[in-house]
Amino acid sequence: MRTRLWDAASAVYERLLTREIDGAPAHVAVIQDGNRRYAREHGDDPTDGYQSGARTTERVLEWCSDLGVEELTLYAFSTENFERPPDQQQHLFDLLESKLREFADADRVHADRVRIRAIGDTGRLPQRVRDAITYAESRTAGYDGFTLNVALAYGGRDELLTAARGVADAVAAGDLDPADIDAQAIESRLHTSPVRDVDLIIRTGGDERTSNFLPWHANGSEAAVFFCTPYWPEFSKVDLLRAIRTYESRAASWRQTRAKRALALVRALGSEVGEARRVLDRFKGALPDPPEDVEAETQSAD
């Protein structure tokens, strides 16, 4: 009885939140945290938690597409994950391999024209996972309806260091003038190139940190951040809608701030123009008349 009441209340709340949404963020990035803790609290193995999380990933992909999100980036395997026990790594590799191939063959992926891309230092992954990446990317390479980025062997600090080394190597080789180093020189050497700036970062599992996820693209757009307590397998559409509402609130606040700044600038400029006119009027009578030849040239030019 209690479960039915909760489900009914959640459905009503979901409809209310959906009505409040007035435009989804273009790019959402998700840190999928809490799979192992979810499994532990349910008396299951960590592998069961990852399987449950994978099912949530499928649902979130559908929700984002339905809500008008254009790009979704999932933090599937970080560089820190290489430090986990070998058996956990192998299970994650098994799951990644199977899900990449499954997504690449899914009817909805092709119906919605979803392009799948892997971002990160993928050369560190086992060959079978790299083969699955190649399969998924090649199967969806021509699509432009929605973009799904899967961050694999990804670390934000590692990405920036790699880009910096690439710039240094280009300068040393004489291919890049130090004076020409700009944001584009860095961005073109990122693992994530080309990826649009992030509008909203979501982290599940209760931790309030972004784990250096997409630092270049998140800071570039000053992305909104939404932390929530549900573990990734528990993440619901209501949680996603609440995150988007947070993004919209922040975007509205930023628009208001920019409008206030623009108004203040207009007022300042208006004050300066008014003062200049008053000074000009004050000295207008003291200014000498233009010479006759200058006046004649002016009239002929008219």
UniProtKB/Swiss-Prot annotation:
Q: Which GO terms describe its biological process?
A: polyprenol biosynthetic process
User: Catalytic activity annotated for this protein?
Assistant: geranylgeranyl diphosphate + 7 isopentenyl diphosphate = tri-trans,hepta-cis-undecaprenyl diphosphate + 7 diphosphate
Question: What Pfam families does the record point to?
Answer: Prenyltransf
| Requisite cofactors | Mg(2+)
Cofactor comment? Binds 2 magnesium ions per subunit.
List cystine links.
none
Q: Which CDD domains match?
A: Cis_IPPS
Asked if the record carries the keyword Magnesium, the reply is: yes
List of residues binding substrate: 34-37, 78-80, 82, 84, 203, 209-211
The answer to whether UniProt assigns keyword Glycoprotein to this entry is no
Q: Where does Mg(2+) bind?
A: 33
One Gene Ontology term of the molecular function aspect: magnesium ion binding
Q: Which UniProt keywords apply?
A: Magnesium, Metal-binding, Transferase
User: What is the E.C. number?
Assistant: 2.5.1.89
Q: Which SUPFAM superfamilies match?
A: Undecaprenyl diphosphate synthase
- InterPro entries in UniProt: UPP_synth-like, UPP_synth-like_CS, UPP_synth-like_sf
Q: How does it assemble?
A: Homodimer.
Question: What is this protein for, i.e. what is its function?
Answer: Catalyzes the sequential condensation of isopentenyl diphosphate (IPP) with geranylgeranyl diphosphate (GGPP) to yield (2Z,6Z,10Z,14Z,18Z,22Z,26Z,30E,34E,38E)-undecaprenyl diphosphate (tritrans,heptacis-UPP). It is probably the precursor of glycosyl carrier lipids.
- According to its UniProt record, which protein family does this protein belong to? Belongs to the UPP synthase family.
Q: What's the name of the protein?
A: Tritrans,polycis-undecaprenyl-diphosphate synthase (geranylgeranyl-diphosphate specific)
**Source organism of this protein record:** Halobacterium salinarum (strain ATCC 700922 / JCM 11081 / NRC-1) (Halobacterium halobium)
